[in-house]
Amino acid sequence: EQVDELGRCGMSYAVCPWVSSFCGAAAALEAEYTLPGISQSVVITRMEGRTPVPEKESIRSFAAHQSTMVIFLSTGMLRRLSEELIRGGYPADTPAAIVYKATWPEEKVLRCTVADLAETAEAENVTKTALIVVGRVLDGEDERSRLYEPSFTTELRKASADPGKRGRPAREDGVRRTDRRAHSTR
C-alpha cells in the first residue's frame, strides 16, 4: 500500500530487507516456533477488528490445528482472543506469551496461558505494540529440532555414536530454561 501511494505521488523510494517482529519475538522468547512432535507449522494472523477476516482464516479456525500461532494487532482484544482460541480447540492452559515491543530496548516478555492473556497484559499495562504467541512450543520441554540433534546426520555432519542427552545445552550464564510457563518480564 505504501509503495503504491509513493508511486502515485511520483516519489522515489527504496525497499529494504527487514526482520519481522515475529522473528524478534522468537529470539526474545528463546524459542523455536516449530519442534518435532509438537508443531511443524506457524500461523501468522490477527484478530478480526474493523477490517474483516475471511471465516476460514478466523482465529477459531486456525486454533483447531493447534499449530504455533503468532497474532498481530490484537492486544486490545485479548479477552475475545482467549475465547476464540479456546473455542477453536486450544486448551485454556496452553502456554502463551505477550511480547511487547519485540526487538526494542523496552522489550518485555510476559509468559502466561491462553486463559489469562488479558489479565497478564493488564497487570503490566500492555495495551498495544505487542505480539501474542500461542502454542506448546512455549512449554519449555527439552524437545529440539532434529537438525541439531547429535544423532542426526546432515550434509555437513555425521551423527555421533553417542547421541548424548536430548534437549538444549545448558546456558553458560547458569540461567535455567526449564520453567517457561511461569510469568516473566525482561
Indicate where each model-derived feature is located.
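A contiguous loop/helix-start segment that scaffolds small-molecule binding in enzyme catalytic cores
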Residues: 1-5, 9, 39-41, 49-171, ...
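Short glycine-cluster motifs
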Residues: 1-48
